[in-house]
């Protein structure tokens, strides 16, 4: 068993990743798969290490307060949608005023 991956860069260049998932000895096949996934993760991290780190640093330099929150959505839009909740179970949950 093996894991295969292929990355096509922005320039169109293809790079193939291949990781065998052989478990040592008579170990469980799932253990071999887990070790293969861990190795593939390492290869992908190596492949994307430099460009991803550079891109993250560029985002922080361009807009540090927005890059740190990790949210790509517009914060103003989030604030506008806070109270847009519906209650389909019945009337509103407001308490009636007690008689005076």
Swiss-Prot record:
Q: Name its cellular compartments.
A: Nucleus
Listed Pfam families: DUF4611
**Annotated InterPro entries:** GON7_meta
Map out region (Disordered) in residue numbers: 50-100
Domain of life of the native organism: Eukaryota
Q: Which sequence positions carry the modification called N-acetylmethionine?
A: 1
Q: In which residue ranges is the amino acid composition biased (Acidic residues)?
A: 66-81
Q: Which GO terms describe its biological process?
A: tRNA threonylcarbamoyladenosine modification
State whether keyword Acetylation applies: yes
The primary site where this protein sits is nucleus
Any one GO CC term of this protein is: nucleus
Keyword annotations: Acetylation, Nucleus
Annotated coiled-coil segments of the chain? none
Role, per record: Component of the EKC/KEOPS complex that is required for the formation of a threonylcarbamoyl group on adenosine at position 37 (t(6)A37) in tRNAs that read codons beginning with adenine. The complex is probably involved in the transfer of the threonylcarbamoyl moiety of threonylcarbamoyl-AMP (TC-AMP) to the N6 group of A37. GON7 plays a supporting role to the catalytic subunit OSGEP in the complex.
**Alphabetical list of PANTHER family matching this protein:** EKC/KEOPS COMPLEX SUBUNIT GON7 (PTHR37363), EKC_KEOPS COMPLEX SUBUNIT GON7 (PTHR37363:SF1)
The subunit structure is:
Component of the EKC/KEOPS complex composed of at least GON7, TP53RK, TPRKB, OSGEP and LAGE3; the whole complex dimerizes.
Protein's name according to its UniProt entry: EKC/KEOPS complex subunit GON7
Organism, per UniProt?
Sus scrofa (Pig)
